[in-house]
Every structure is written in C-alpha cells, then in structure tokens.
C-alpha cells in the first residue's frame, strides 16, 4: 500500500491514458524433426547452436537440481563442457550448454548448446558435443566445484534497486509468490552427483535438435552435416531483409 501511495504521488499520468497496444508474443515451436539451418558467412571458423524444445512446462520443484546441473555441465571454465571441448580435446574456441527455464507459464524449457570452432574441426566438435551431452562425463571433483560455486553465488548475490520490482514481476509470470532462489539455496547442499546424473538422463539425454550454423558452406563437410537433419539454407535477405 505504501508503494502504491508513493507511486501515485510521484508518477504523473494523463487523465485518460492511451490504451497499450497488444504485444504479439513469440510462439515457441516444439522440435519434433531434426533440421540444420545454415547461414552464409565467409570465415575459417563457424558458430553452431543446437536447440531443443520438447514442451515441458515450468516446474519449480526441479529448480534446485536444474540449477546444479547447469552449473556442473555448462556453468563456466570448470564445467564439463569447457573442460571437455576446449581444454581436453581442443575442439572449440568457446563452448557452452544449458537447460534454460521458461520466462512465463506458457513457455517451455529450452536446451541450447553453442560452440565456435574451426571449419575443419566442425564435425569432430559436433560429434564430441553430442557425446558429452547424451553421455555426460561424471567427475566428483567437478561436481564439488560446481556445488560450491552455486552456493557462493546464491549466498552473496543481492537484489536491490529496480531489480526488486523486476524480480517480483518475473516470479509473477511463473505463478510464484516467493523467491525461488531461497528454495534452491536451502536444498542445494543435500543434492548429490547421482542426482545430477539422474536429471541429465531424464531431461537432457536423446533430445531432438534444430541446428543453426553460421559459416562458409564451401569449406564445410556438408555430406556429414546431412546426417544431423534436412539442410535448409537461410539467405542474408531472409535474415536482414536486403
């Protein structure tokens, strides 16, 4: 009530405000058939993104294990993706992967993985990426680092200023009347590496993907790319309108 009083006193509006135009929301598409989109870009390296949407709606009960999986698998330089794709195998300049939460109840979870690599390493990188996504390497040391990093971030982060109202609005879009980070923090310490593996098996393994490649088709192994889905070429005109 105090917030509303202060807002009304200081935020002046027209006597008859204009009607807000209805926003056309982007409708997510369930990925049922594998497709490879390629956009032309003449360079000796490519950027490749895999995206999968199965239609799973928001579930606050999985938030703790979901957050820990993301931290363990694709959260940073100590995560499995970076260590395997860049440090151990030298197959990517950069690599990341995560299962993203919906922003509103009508949306779905999205698994998205991205790599940047040399043209001649693309197929090796894609094969290796598929391997670790579906058969996730298990490391107790990496798990402990991920758990500690997540706990530390939750313990030290602060919601201040305008972020207070935005966090409230974001939670409201998901039907929440509480801070989900509090639940994550309270439960994270009891989760195990076996829990992360179980989550990966249920939520990530063997998904169907749409793959987007930005690169020079003439310098890529397109015959092998076809194994990942029907190829659809996207022109610069389609992307930018000219």
Describe these PLM feature segments.
Residues 30-34, 62-66, 108-110, 180-181:
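Flexible glycine/proline-enriched surface loops and loop-helix/loop-strand junctions
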Residues 45-57, 82-135, 140-193, 206-214:
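M16 family metallopeptidases and their MPP-like homologs
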């Amino acid at each position: 009530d105090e917030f509303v009083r202060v807002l009304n006193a200081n935020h002046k509006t027209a006597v008859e405000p204009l009607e807000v135009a209805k926003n056309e929301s982007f409708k997510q598409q369930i990925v049922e058939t594998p497709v490879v989109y390629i956009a032309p870009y003449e360079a000796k390296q490519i950027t490749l993104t895999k995206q999968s949407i199965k239609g799973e709606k928001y579930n606050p009960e999985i938030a703790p294990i979901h957050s820990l999986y993301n931290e363990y698998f694709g959260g940073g330089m100590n995560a499995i993706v970076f260590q395997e794709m860049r440090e151990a195998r030298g197959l990517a300049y950069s690599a990341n992967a995560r299962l993203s939460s919906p922003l509103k109840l009508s949306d779905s979870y999205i698994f998205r993985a991205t790599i940047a690599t040399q043209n001649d390493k693309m197929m090796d990188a894609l094969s290796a990426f598929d391997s670790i996504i579906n058969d996730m390497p298990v490391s107790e040391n990496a798990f402990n680092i991920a758990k500690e990093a997540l706990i530390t971030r939750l313990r030290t982060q602060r919601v201040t200023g305008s972020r207070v109202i935005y966090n409230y609005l974001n939670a409201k879009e998901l039907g929440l009347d509480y801070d989900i980070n509090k639940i994550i923090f309270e439960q994270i310490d009891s989760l195990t590496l076996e829990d992360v593996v179980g989550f990966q098996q249920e939520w990530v393994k063997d998904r169907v993907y749409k793959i987007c490649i930005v690169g020079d088709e003439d310098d890529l192994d397109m015959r092998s790319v076809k194994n990942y889905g029907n190829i659809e070429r996207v022109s610069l005109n389609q992307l930018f309108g000219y």
